[in-house]
Amino acid sequence: MRRAEALAALRVLDIRPADVQFLALPDQGLTDLLLRDCDRALTRITRVIDDWSPTDILAPSLFDIHPDHNAVAVMMRLIFADFSAPRISQWNYLVHGRSAAFFDRSAELSSSESETAKKREAIRCHRTQIKLSKRRFLRYAARPERFLRVERESAVRRDGAVYSVSRAHDNLDVDLRFSVDPFRMPRNKFFILGRDSLGRTRACQIRLPSRSADLKVLDCATNRSVGIARYRGHPFAGEFTLPLHLFSPIHDLFIKVDRRSWFFDEAGWIEIPGVPSLANVAPSMISAEAYSLAAR
């Protein structure tokens, strides 16, 4: 049903079925896939990119608050960390949310009246998806499109509950500020994802408490304890230090505070650049301060 609706919408936009390829990834399940078993999905997407040889790729933003959207965004970052494709331009778009980290830096592309009408017609093709929120989805057609070019130097931004984060070679310091939301407060989790020393994807989670405590760091794939994080805080703010022995220091990390309410996250993922190799960087540049992302 959803696939037929998608094809109908694409026909409205003059895209032929022969130019469409579906990946059959799980609806409302991409965050779980990302955290527990994403390597096969990454391989499939990489093959599609290699086969199609695109000049531009448009993908969801890390800052989109739909958990499926921001999970795909992380997957694309992981793929292009390994994929040598200098001629491919990457662009992100945001459907859900109002993240300043996206809107302050994205470029606006206005639509003509005929283009807006076509977008409305395409949206109406997704009957099962818009059944409960038709007006909201149709309003999306009237707003300008916005795209943010993916660039290495602009990868890291604070967002949502993450007030600041500082990465050193062996640990990660995170400062959190929580909004007062009774629907989110009881379910706070912290996710961290990266590569291990062999280049494999690893993900861990911590259940955030309402007071200071030593917390188990759990491997998302096995649910086994792999370390201890020291948390200091209260229901509205906190900070903790997370050991990074499972993760390669030269690869980027992705972190997210999971405060989901109904379908949507409070915020998406934040990308944290890898620490340069000690063999290639002068000692004076290795301090944790060099990687501090705190707002001053």
Can you say where each PLM-predicted feature lies in the sequence?
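A conserved mid-domain beta-alpha-beta active-site/ligand-binding segment of alpha/beta enzyme cores
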Residues: A100-E153
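Surface beta-strand/loop "capping" patches
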Residues: A142-V180
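Active-site beta-strand->loop->alpha-helix modules in alpha/beta enzyme cores, enriched
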Residues: M1-R87, E121-C125, K131, F137-Y140, ...
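Residues at the C-termini of beta-strands that transition into short coil/loop
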Residues: A24-P26, L94-H96, S112
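Short, flexible loop segments at boundaries between secondary-structure elements
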Residues: S84-R105
